[in-house]
């Protein structure tokens, strides 16, 4: 009779080997993905009065889309190594919507300058290196190339961003983007 402890140890060993093999297969494709956004970031400057004089502080107001539609087409495939199988996927995303621009009163009482020309749109992607191609975003009928990395690591650890030219007289603007990401289960 085989001791129960030996069987449990063998099962744990095989489970560990399966997880390692699946990670190895996925490493050349892409990890599990989480996609967040887009987020519009608008920097602004405040001059705060104080006992020691005026302090000048730069802040960022973050705005989420008023409306957003996402169409995702997902294709999966299995890859095998030895007796182990990993499920890989490729997800094609089409994202569009509308951002309402904030009124100047949303920026705070002591705001002296809203830096509309330094606005940025970010999309958080767990592993942006798994993007299938260069990503563009169209904002108010103008096309911008999205750069690798988030504009501000405080909101996303990884992702893509584009600096966009905004006009303070706009009330809202449309956006759309399409990108494909590789990932694994």
Model regions: which residues?
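Hydrophobic alpha-helical transmembrane signal-anchor segments
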Residues: 1-9
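Soluble non-transmembrane domains of integral membrane proteins
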Residues: 16, 20, 27-28, 32-37, ...
């Amino acid at each position: 009779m085989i001791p129960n402890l030996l069987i449990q140890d063998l099962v744990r060993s095989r489970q560990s080997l399966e997880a390692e093999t699946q990670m190895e297969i996925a490493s050349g494709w892409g990890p599990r993905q989480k996609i967040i956004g887009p987020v519009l970031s608008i920097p602004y400057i405040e001059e705060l009065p104080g006992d020691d004089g005026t302090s000048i502080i730069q802040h960022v107001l973050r705005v989420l889309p008023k409306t957003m539609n996402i169409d995702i087409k997902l294709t999966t495939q299995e890859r095998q190594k030895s007796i182990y199988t990993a499920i890989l996927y490729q997800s094609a995303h089409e994202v569009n919507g509308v951002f309402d621009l904030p009124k100047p009163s949303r920026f705070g009482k002591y705001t002296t300058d809203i830096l509309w020309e330094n606005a940025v749109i970010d999309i958080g992607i767990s592993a942006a290196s798994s993007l299938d191609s260069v990503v563009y975003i169209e904002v108010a009928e103008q096309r911008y190339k999205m750069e690798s990395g988030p504009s501000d690591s405080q909101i996303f650890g990884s992702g893509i961003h584009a600096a966009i030219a905004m006009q303070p007289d706009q009330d809202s603007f449309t956006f759309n983007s399409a990108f494909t990401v590789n990932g694994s289960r």
